[in-house]
From Swiss-Prot:
Annotated region (Beta-hairpin required for oligomerization), positions in chain: 197-208
Similarity comment: family membership: Belongs to the GOLPH3/VPS74 family.
Region feature (Disordered): 1-26
Pfam families according to UniProt: GPP34 (PF05719)
Protein name according to UniProt: Vacuolar protein sorting-associated protein 74
Keyword set, alphabetical order: Golgi apparatus, Lipid-binding, Membrane, Phosphoprotein, Protein transport, Transport
Subunit structure: Homotetramer. Interacts with coatomer complex. May interact with ARF1.
Source taxonomy: Eukaryota, Fungi, Dikarya, Ascomycota, Saccharomycotina
Recorded consequence of changing R181A: Abolishes phosphoinositide binding and Golgi localization
Compositionally biased region (Polar residues): 15-26
């Protein structure tokens, strides 16, 4: 039995938002609030439109980029022309499950169970609860959310193990997410980032996914290098990652930590000189250690002279998005799992 199979386990789910109704008299017990919005009907007269405030919250307060965190990590591991991942990478599958947990937290779907006794446990051992089971439109996220919703609260590390199929619990063996890499690649094809080609490998044909839009991957690389190489971090934005993205700094840190855990970070650093590449890896490890605890240690300054403004930017981002501490605690817990992956694998 491999050491990878000695980990732990656990869950997921998804649900639908409540339907929208308008009425003249709303009672206090109504779950759906009717909020009037002025609009013009066909006759030019003003008309009131009712909508679900939960939908408005997701649309206006949580701005989601085009690509999920899992898709960005997969892109960093893909060979541009060949369109497939390294056959020797046994870390990426486990890391992608962790990225699913982070993505759900960034979207406000899950958080750490608010129990004062939780602080006796490591971050990765704290329990997760679902706070919004509405569908995201991303199949892997919705599948995971549905599993979480239907099960009791389980720890971060339990969930990553379960989604990876690393469990001895036969009742939960079906929690393993199937064909994650292939499904992510097909999602990127649908978004116009990759294309599908059939290539012959000895005796069989295999679907590969070469890069169709090189600008997307280059933008991801620039964002990573801005944090790991530049003295002052300054993120670049595009149609895939707009400036209005919620928690854009923390999402970028999650990309770096997820890529490090998936053993694909060095793919971005191949064009750098040896010394710069070594310093970038050291900075990634420094970030992993700093942000795998919560509250984040924002008083600790980097010793490498790289992205010296990172702490200030993260502090401002958290202050501008109050009330998300328990979601950020989930992210820190996954970072803790990533930091131990060498021992786990």
């Amino acid at each position: 039995m491999s050491t990878l199979q000695r980990r732990r386990v656990n869950r997921a789910d998804s649900g639908d938002t409540s339907s929208i109704h308008s009425s003249a008299n709303n009672t206090k017990g109504d779950k759906i609030a009717n909020i009037a919005v002025d609009g013009d009907d066909d006759n030019g007269t003003n008309k009131k439109i009712a909508y679900d405030p939960e939908e408005s919250k997701l649309r206006d307060n949580i701005n989601i980029p085009t690509l999920t965190l899992m898709e960005e990590v997969l892109l960093m591991g893909l060979r541009d022309r060949e369109g497939y991942l390294s056959f020797w990478n046994d870390s990426i599958s486990y890391a992608l499950r962790g990225c699913i947990i982070i993505e759900l937290a960034l979207r406000g779907k899950i958080r750490i169970l608010d129990d004062s006794a939780r602080k006796r446990f490591d971050l990765s051992e704290r329990l997760i609860e679902v706070i919004d089971s509405s569908k995201t439109g991303e199949v892997l996220l919705d599948e995971t959310l549905q599993l979480m919703k239907n099960d009791e609260p389980l720890s971060i590390s339990n969930w990553i193990d379960l989604l990876s199929g690393e469990t001895w619990n036969l009742l939960k063996i079906n929690y393993q997410l199937k064909q994650v890499r292939e499904r992510l690649a097909k999602g990127l094809v649908d978004k116009g980032v990759l294309r599908t080609e059939m290539k012959n490998f000895f005796l069989f044909d295999m679907a590969t996914h070469p890069i169709a839009d090189a600008s997307c991957k280059e933008a991801i690389k620039r964002r990573v290098l801005s944090v790991l190489v530049s003295r002052n971090m300054e993120l670049s934005y595009n149609e895939y990652f707009p400036e209005t993205t919620s928690f854009k700094i923390i999402r970028t840190l999650a990309l770096i930590c997820g890529s490090y855990g998936a053993n694909v970070l060095e793919n971005v650093l191949t064009t750098l000189e040896y010394e710069k590449r070594d310093k970038a890896i050291s900075r990634a490890e420094e970030i992993m250690a700093q942000f795998s605890q919560y509250p984040f240690d924002l008083e600790k300054e980097t010793e490498l002279g790289v992205s010296v403004n990172l702490n200030k930017e993260v502090k401002e981002e958290i202050e501008n998005n109050p009330g998300h501490d328990l979601q950020l605690e989930v992210i820190a817990g996954v970072f803790e799992v990533f930091s131990r992956m060498d021992m786990l694998l």
